[in-house]
Every structure is written in C-alpha cells, then in structure tokens.
Amino acid sequence: MAKAASKGKADGPDPIVQAAFALAARLRWRHVTLADIADEAKVSLAELYHAYPSKDAILAAYTSAVDEMVLAGAEPPDEEESVKDRLFDALMRRFDAMKPQRDGIAAILRDGAEGPVSMLCGAARLLRSMAWTLESVGVSASGPAGAIKTKGLLAVYLGTLRVWLRDDTEDLSRTMAALDKRLARAEQFASTLFGGRRRATPPPEQPPVEPAPPA
C-alpha cells in the first residue's frame, strides 16, 4: 500500500485529507469512519493512525494546508494598496484554495464536525488562520488590539463563507461581491481592523524653552 503523504504542503491537502473530504461529500461526516478514510485513501489503518490519529486531526491538517496555500501566495505588503484590498486578495485566495473540497466542507459544517469540542477546536484554528492572514497583509495580530482585529476578520470571513458555499458562479463573483461588501462595512465601522503596523517615528521636537524675564 502507498505510504501516507506528508502533511501541510503548500500545494494543497494530501491524499488522505482529500479522501476524507470526498467521503464527507458523499456521506454524512458523522457516519464516515477512520476505516472508510483509510480505504478511500488506499492506506492501511496503521499508516492512517501514524499520519492522523483522529478525524479532528484530519480537519486540523486541512486548515493548515489551506493556510500554507494562502501564505504561499502572499506578496510583501504594498503601502500604496489599502489594507481592505490586501485582505480581499488574501481571503479570496483562501476561498479559491478550498473550492475543490467545497462539497465536503458543506457536509462537515452541516454535521457540526464531531460535536461541540470539535467545533470549539475548529474556531480556535480559524482564529489562528485569521491572525496569520492579518500578518500577511501587514497588520499586527499581536496583543489585545490584535485579538480584536482577528475576531473582526473572522466575522467577515464566516459571513462570506455562507455565500461561498452556495456560489455557483465559475469566478466566484457572488463571493467576491459579498466579501467586498463586508470588508467595506468593517472599514467603515471598525477602523481598528484596518490599522496596519505603524512605523516608529521620533517624537516631535519641542521648542526651546525661553528663560523667564527677570522680575
């Protein structure tokens, strides 16, 4: 049997992860077993266990693979381009990267992954993904302010995700329109989301203090 492929490659999810999402699209995710995934991927259970000891580990690997594809396509931030436009490009790279597995993603979301624990783990993974997205466009995701920006971007992403799941256009034009609208709204009402890294600047020079006139 084929050996399990390495995880987290920038060129996309490995065959085991792809097999899991293909099964999710055909069956209910909660009904897909690890044995089913091994059979679909043409690997032994031992090889599957070595690569991914649980279905949640497969979902985590998928998120990481998508993150790597998004970051691999990132370019150094252009100061002439607005943060809104940079975020638009980064999130559209994410939707483009996920398109081959869209049916599987929809099925997994309908089933709520494997219950509350998996859903909470998924939320943590998405927050990490959004933090990396912010960093890739030149916006710091560190500290309390970074946490607010990360959660704000996650809200934009999840709102657009609902449109993307139903978008049957070849160029994802509905998704692009929805994303642009949500980012524009965020830009209008939550300027902290679009606050990039500020260059360190010296404090303004103080005017010289004139000696007080004699009394």
Question: What is the predicted role of each segment?
Answer:
Residues 15, 23-61:
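Helix-turn-helix
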Residues 3-16:
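Short, Lys/Arg-enriched anionic-surface-contact patches
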